């Protein structure tokens, strides 16, 4: 159990003490590298830890959810399922839209995933419907990731169709080309088209069918190659008037002749310029608009991407007419910048508080300047390494540097205090610097490497949480390493040049008063320590009680995953009865918008109705509520959400689900609430049986709120039951029936108009305003084999049934997602346990599997690994300390201080009403590294006193405790004040920082009080144990 003797010649610090110019220039180089690194570092909310995610969207207007599932989604899923590196595949098939989200392993590059997706789409092409208007389109974007920027385009003078056309060609395409942009979507569905609305009675009276009209239009509007003539002297390209560009041209189109007279399209239909899809709409506040949502690619830097968009916007909007107004409704980077700025301010506050506490203890300006230089130098130098590692300035790295403020000053304080002690004894400053630095060098190395050992397990945390805290752990470790280098080089050199007996003895009224105060505190501590050493077993029982209390608090404290942030943006889903039409839903949405916009915290609102890549059915609407900046509103986001939901409850027939947007997005599906739980089965029938039963029980749980499900199986279906025998007798096939129905009610895209800038569609449908509702089916006519016109009603009956509004898959099997929030008086851990207990009471069949998704799944994973993470940190520290001390016993003495940190942190979190989440757990792990510093400083000096002065273990540890009391108190207060700004944080992003500060401040206060007494007692008990063990071995050897 011997340690290396401290050197009196300066050890590794001697070279730097004796060469002040070289040392100064070396530090200047570190400072300049850090400043350059800081200017080069990108800014972001959190480290870039996104899963490589690709979304594949296929539109098939008029197709029902079951047709989309079987004809589009399933063939694509089979191909995608063969890709390597695929982590999860989810899909949503609704009326006319299939959306497949592919999430890949973190280790797979996004570009590689993109190539595999493109190859899979190509392989599935022959399996998809032949009349699919457009092939599947993929985007490198996570649909659950909220847009980084939302813009509204409005006009008081132009129709929305023209506005969307201009925005799509002049603005959206250019923004899509910006590096980092994954997808630009235009919500509002006002893409220009020529709409042909057939008068069913008119065509029936003329003996025509919709298929006759469709064939006439498709044959009259073509755009194909015609060849060229190559003569002896000239070459001539052939062209023709085969394209029709306007609604007026289509009106004049002759579709048939009757009795020698032409029948024009305008005679049997209303032909007009309109929108390609009349069941889509978007609004900005109360005004109809084209809403442009910009989403980033996974892994792209959000700040630089948004900056590029803003720089380009003025140039893009110049090309638009003056009546067209482009407004930025939301920009997520505004809150990200504010959050980072607040964290930087807290970092500056931490540095100021730490320097203040140094002056309070040292009471000497030159002695205060030395650590005052070491702290910012260590932190600034870290930026240079961060650039090399491709890190960013984000909330977590800045939190690491803020916490590091208390860490890095420790080393300088320990060195200065030890050197000052020798100067006060009469040593020359140079000799004192050499002797003091050499004596303390081993302690600094022990402190540094044992603290870094605590951080090592963070690097091995799995999945996205591990990636998230990788930058935190490495940034903190680098700052600690640089601090150790500075403390062993610059600090002793400055002590040798700036400290003297005169400067240390020079006192004013404040220093004399504080000196007396510290002397009284040390004397009182000495008296208390003597009493404690006389009652070792009582003290040991207190230490064991803290261990037991830590375990109990760990079991009972509310547990969460990640703090809910207030980013100033709320995502909402509006739900209406399943049979709601587009017009009905649009009206309800406007009613809800009126209510929301009256709230004093709301700045703007965008809303969308219709089926697209994010909205699965006509009975739901998507909302984005943009709040005023935090300093301009009285309430935080959770209170605003509660107030809005209460207000909207007064609107009949709708349910509103709200959740605040978060910087960390783990989900791959746009959800109604923050947390998800899925049921997966081999068939839809099994889900239809068990989902309602589970929902009924979950909605009764007090641990859950806003419980809802995406299972909607009460969508109205008009089932056309064809008498196949009768149809066959008339020469009518099922394809003829499907075509007739599709022509009438599918907003069928039957032809394409080509222009120099864009392509537009011709849309065919029946004019349902003439014959609304199910009566429109009685107007359908088909052509028999002999050319006669046959009413559909003569060969078919229409039955009203129910069917799902959307069909969801997870890894190719049907799935239902139950979404929920957690009330304020419960934690996510409570909710998860309640769901699991409820599931057990149902006795679900074996063919139904359940699983938490997104943040909830990550919470389970993180919670399961937390205990092992802490154990790994303790084991890593034990190994490092054992190697440094060449002892099996002393590391245990040092680690015995850890339960006190756990008790303090957990108690502080419970008193503050905070959950034990991932951020708080990181704080507890850091406490393990801080608290053991006290024990290291005590034990190092006690061992030295035993070895060099021949003291007894009791006298040695007693003297070590008194000698090191002031630096222990100083370093603990420095670490506490470094964490204090985080605990008291109230600005943007405070929710993320506060748990770390609360846990560390609580842990430091409790551990500081207890370890000053428990550590020396445990040191003596283990010393007696070691002596007893040696005597036993010696006795056995003598007997042998």
UniProtKB/Swiss-Prot annotation:
<feature type="transmembrane region" description="Helical">
    <location>
        <begin position="968"/>
        <end position="988"/>
    </location>
</feature>
<feature type="transmembrane region" description="Helical">
    <location>
        <begin position="16"/>
        <end position="36"/>
    </location>
</feature>
<dbReference type="InterPro" id="IPR022831">
    <property type="entry name" value="Multidrug-R_MdtB"/>
</dbReference>
<comment type="subunit">
    <text>Part of a tripartite efflux system composed of MdtA, MdtB and MdtC. MdtB forms a heteromultimer with MdtC.</text>
</comment>
<feature type="transmembrane region" description="Helical">
    <location>
        <begin position="537"/>
        <end position="557"/>
    </location>
</feature>
<keyword id="KW-0813">Transport</keyword>
<feature type="transmembrane region" description="Helical">
    <location>
        <begin position="369"/>
        <end position="389"/>
    </location>
</feature>
<keyword id="KW-0997">Cell inner membrane</keyword>
<keyword id="KW-0812">Transmembrane</keyword>
<dbReference type="Pfam" id="PF00873">
    <property type="entry name" value="ACR_tran"/>
</dbReference>
<dbReference type="GO" id="GO:0042910">
    <property type="term" value="F:xenobiotic transmembrane transporter activity"/>
</dbReference>
<protein>
    <recommendedName>
        <fullName>Multidrug resistance protein MdtB</fullName>
    </recommendedName>
</protein>
<keyword id="KW-1133">Transmembrane helix</keyword>
<feature type="transmembrane region" description="Helical">
    <location>
        <begin position="888"/>
        <end position="908"/>
    </location>
</feature>
<comment type="similarity">
    <text>Belongs to the resistance-nodulation-cell division (RND) (TC 2.A.6) family. MdtB subfamily.</text>
</comment>
<feature type="transmembrane region" description="Helical">
    <location>
        <begin position="347"/>
        <end position="367"/>
    </location>
</feature>
<feature type="transmembrane region" description="Helical">
    <location>
        <begin position="396"/>
        <end position="416"/>
    </location>
</feature>
<dbReference type="GO" id="GO:0005886">
    <property type="term" value="C:plasma membrane"/>
</dbReference>
<keyword id="KW-0472">Membrane</keyword>
<feature type="transmembrane region" description="Helical">
    <location>
        <begin position="911"/>
        <end position="931"/>
    </location>
</feature>
<keyword id="KW-1003">Cell membrane</keyword>
<dbReference type="InterPro" id="IPR001036">
    <property type="entry name" value="Acrflvin-R"/>
</dbReference>
<feature type="transmembrane region" description="Helical">
    <location>
        <begin position="440"/>
        <end position="460"/>
    </location>
</feature>
<dbReference type="InterPro" id="IPR027463">
    <property type="entry name" value="AcrB_DN_DC_subdom"/>
</dbReference>
<feature type="transmembrane region" description="Helical">
    <location>
        <begin position="998"/>
        <end position="1018"/>
    </location>
</feature>
<feature type="transmembrane region" description="Helical">
    <location>
        <begin position="863"/>
        <end position="883"/>
    </location>
</feature>
<feature type="transmembrane region" description="Helical">
    <location>
        <begin position="472"/>
        <end position="492"/>
    </location>
</feature>
<comment type="function">
    <text>The MdtABC tripartite complex confers resistance against novobiocin and deoxycholate.</text>
</comment>
């Amino acid at each position: 159990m011997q340690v290396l003797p401290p050197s009196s010649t300066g050890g590794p610090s001697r070279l730097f003490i004796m060469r002040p110019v070289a040392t100064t220039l070396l530090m200047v180089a570190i400072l300049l590298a850090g400043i350059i690194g800081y200017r080069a570092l990108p800014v972001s909310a959190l480290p870039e830890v996104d899963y490589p995610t690709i979304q594949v969207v296929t539109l098939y207007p008029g197709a029902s959810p079951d047709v989309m599932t079987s004809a589009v989604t399933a063939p694509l899923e089979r191909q995608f399922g063969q890709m390597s590196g695929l982590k999860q595949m989810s899909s949503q098939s609704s009326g006319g839209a299939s959306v497949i989200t592919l999430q890949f392993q973190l280790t797979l590059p996004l570009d590689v995933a993109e190539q595999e997706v493109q190859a899979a789409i190509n392989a599935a092409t022959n399996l998809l419907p032949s009349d699919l208007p457009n092939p599947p389109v993929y985007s490198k974007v996570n649909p659950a990731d909220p847009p980084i920027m939302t813009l509204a385009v409005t006009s008081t003078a132009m129709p929305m169709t023209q506005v969307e056309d201009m925005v799509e060609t002049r603005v959206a395409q250019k923004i899509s080309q910006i590096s980092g942009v994954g997808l630009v979507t235009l919500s509002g569905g006002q893409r220009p088209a020529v709409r042909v609305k057939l008068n069913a009675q008119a065509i029936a009276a003329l003996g025509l069918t919709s298929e006759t009209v469709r064939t006439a239009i498709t044959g009259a509007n073509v755009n194909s190659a015609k060849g060229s003539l190559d003569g002896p002297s000239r070459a001539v390209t052939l062209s023709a008037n085969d394209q029709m560009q306007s609604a007026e041209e289509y009106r004049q189109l002759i579709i048939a002749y009757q009795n020698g007279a032409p029948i024009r399209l305008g005679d049997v239909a209303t032909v007009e310029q309109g929108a390609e899809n009349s069941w889509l709409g978007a609004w900005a506040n109360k005004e109809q608009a084209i809403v442009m949502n910009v989403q980033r690619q996974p892994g792209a830097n959000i700040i630089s991407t948004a900056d590029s968009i803003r720089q380009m916007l003025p140039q893009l909007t110049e090309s638009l007419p003056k009546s067209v107004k482009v407004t930025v409704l939301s920009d997520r980077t505004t809150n990200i910048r504010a959050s980072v700025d607040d964290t930087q301010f807290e970092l500056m506050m931490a540095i100021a508080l730490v320097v203040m506490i140094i002056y309070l203890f040292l009471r000497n300006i030159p002695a205060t300047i030395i650590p005052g230089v070491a702290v910012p130098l260590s932190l600034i130098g870290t930026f240079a390494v961060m650039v090399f590692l491709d890190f960013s300035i984000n909330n977590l790295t800045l939190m690491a540097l803020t916490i590091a403020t208390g860490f890095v000053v420790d080393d300088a304080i320990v060195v200065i205090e030890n050197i000052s002690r020798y100067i006060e004894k009469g040593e020359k400053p140079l000799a004192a610097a050499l002797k003091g630095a050499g004596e303390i060098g081993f302690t600094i190395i022990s402190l540094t490497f044992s603290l870094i050992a605590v951080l090592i397990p963070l690097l091995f945390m799995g999945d996205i949480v591990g990636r998230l805290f990788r930058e935190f752990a490495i940034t903190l470790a680098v700052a600690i390493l640089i601090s150790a280098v500075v403390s062993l080089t610059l600090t002793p050199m400055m002590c040798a040049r700036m400290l003297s007996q005169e400067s240390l003895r020079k006192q004013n009224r404040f220093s004399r008063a504080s000196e007396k105060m510290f002397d009284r505190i040390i004397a009182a501590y000495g008296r208390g320590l003597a009493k404690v050493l006389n009652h070792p077993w009582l003290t040991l029982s207190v230490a064991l009680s803290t261990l037991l209390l830590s375990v109990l608090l760990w079991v009972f404290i509310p547990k969460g995953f990640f703090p809910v942030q207030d980013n100033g943006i709320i995502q909402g889903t509006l739900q209406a009865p399943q049979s709601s039409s587009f017009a009905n839903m649009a009206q309800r949405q406007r009613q809800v918008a009126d209510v929301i916009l009256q709230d004093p915290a709301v700045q703007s609102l965008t809303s969308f109705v219709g089926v697209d890549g994010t909205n699965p059915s006509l009975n739901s609407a998507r909302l984005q509520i943009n709040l005023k900046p935090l300093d301009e509103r009285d309430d935080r986001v959770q209170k605003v959400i509660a107030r809005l939901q209460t207000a909207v409850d007064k609107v009949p027939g709708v349910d509103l689900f709200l959740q605040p947007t978060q910087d960390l997005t783990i989900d791959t599906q746009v959800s109604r609430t923050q947390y998800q739980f899925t049921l997966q089965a081999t068939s839809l029938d099994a889900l239809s049986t068990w989902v309602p039963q589970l929902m009924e029980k979950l909605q009764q749980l007090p641990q859950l709120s806003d419980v809802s499900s995406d299972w909607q199986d009460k969508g109205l279906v008009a089932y056309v039951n064809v008498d196949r025998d009768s149809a066959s007798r008339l020469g009518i096939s099922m394809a003829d029936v499907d075509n007739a129905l599709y022509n009438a009610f599918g907003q069928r895209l039957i032809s394409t108009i080509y222009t120099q800038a864009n392509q537009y569609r011709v849309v065919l449908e029946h004019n349902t305003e003439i014959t609304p509702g199910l009566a429109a089916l009685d107007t359908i006519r088909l052509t028999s084999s002999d050319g006669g016109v046959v009413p559909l009603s003569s060969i078919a009956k229409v039955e009203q049934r129910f069917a799902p509004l959307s069909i969801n898959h997870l890894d190719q099997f049907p799935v239902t997602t139950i979404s929920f929030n957690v009330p304020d008086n419960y934690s996510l851990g409570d909710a998860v346990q309640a769901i699991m207990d409820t599931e057990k009471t149902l006795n679900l069949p074996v063919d139904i599997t359940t699983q938490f998704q997104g943040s909830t799944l990550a919470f389970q994973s993180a919670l399961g690994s937390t205990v092992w993470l802490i154990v790994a940190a303790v084991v890593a520290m034990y190994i490092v300390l054992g190697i440094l001390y060449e002892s099996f016993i002393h590391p245990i003495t040092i680690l015995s201080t850890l339960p006190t940190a756990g008790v303090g942190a957990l108690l502080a979190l419970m008193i503050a009403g905070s959950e034990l989440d991932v951020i708080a757990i990181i704080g507890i792990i850091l406490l393990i590294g801080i608290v053991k510093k006290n024990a290291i400083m005590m034990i190092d000096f006690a061992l030295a006193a035993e070895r060099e002065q021949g003291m007894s273990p009791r006298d040695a540890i007693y003297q070590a405790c008194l000698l090191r009391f002031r630096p222990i108190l100083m370093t603990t207060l420095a670490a506490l004040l470094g964490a204090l700004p985080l605990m008291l944080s109230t600005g943007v992003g405070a929710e993320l920082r506060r748990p770390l500060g609360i846990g560390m401040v609580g842990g430091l206060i409790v551990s500081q009080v207890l370890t000053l007494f428990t550590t020396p007692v445990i040191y003596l008990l283990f010393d007696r144990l070691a002596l007893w063990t040696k005597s036993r071995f010696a006795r056995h050897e003598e007997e042998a």
